[in-house]
A protein has these predicted regions:
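Class I SAM-dependent methyltransferase Rossmann-like catalytic core
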Residues: 3-55
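S-adenosylmethionine/decaboxylated-SAM
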Residues: 31-38, 44-200
Length: 200
């Protein structure tokens, strides 16, 4: 107990920033969710709709950040399974990885989400043990090479629905659009906001 209190006090500034920003997000007044790594209401509705097209789906979110999307998916995926993947190497508040993971676990508490603390490449190796994956949502690294590797893996693995975030994002460091178009062809991609999925 004392150790937890000391950790909280040590990271108080970071935790306070995270809590106040999450409160801001929940208030519905945030205008720049992209800077915080979040989805707009339109995007969240689309992703949740995609995940409920069939009952009992196994859904994987790669790059969960704080688990808000995964938690929303778990609340809607009846009889299915939701796995959130993150290695906690980045967050918009600069929280240390240990604090970031702990904070995310608190957000996911009480939900059915399974949290895997691994990076995308490690997840793809371990995914063989999962059986069929009905839907994968990529929102981890946005670097062209990483996104292309994720998309190629999902295509080879026979993932039922391949989707992700930040398609069309003008950030020059992001290569999502280029990677997705190269692997699947622009004509085969459905876009809602900056969320994308390969058309069935």
């Amino acid at each position: 107990m004392i150790r937890r209190l000391m950790t909280l006090l040590w990271h108080w500034r970071e935790a306070k920033s995270a809590f106040s920003t999450l409160g801001y997000l929940y208030s519905g007044t945030a205008h720049d969710l992209d800077a915080l790594g979040g989805l707009t209401d339109e995007e969240m509705s689309a992703v949740c709709r995609w995940a409920t097209e069939r009952p009992g789906m196994t859904v994987v979110e790669v790059g969960t950040l704080f688990g808000l999307t995964a938690r929303a998916l778990a609340a809607r995926v009846a009889g299915g399974r939701v796995i959130a993947v993150d290695n906690f190497s980045w967050n918009p508040f600069g929280l240390p990885a240990r604090v970031h993971e702990s904070f995310t676990r608190r957000i996911l508490a009480g939900s059915s989400v399974e949290l895997w603390n691994v990076d995308s490449a490690s997840f793809r190796e371990k995914a063989k043990t999962l059986g069929a994956i009905d839907m994968v949502f990529f929102d981890a690294s946005h670097v062209y090479e990483d996104v292309k590797a994720e998309c190629e893996w999902a295509k080879r693995a026979g993932v039922g629905m391949i989707c992700g975030h930040d398609y069309g994002n003008p950030n020059p460091r992001f290569g999502v659009t280029r990677a997705v178009d190269e692997v699947f062809g622009r004509e085969n991609v459905e876009v809602v906001g900056m969320c994308w999925r390969v058309k069935a």
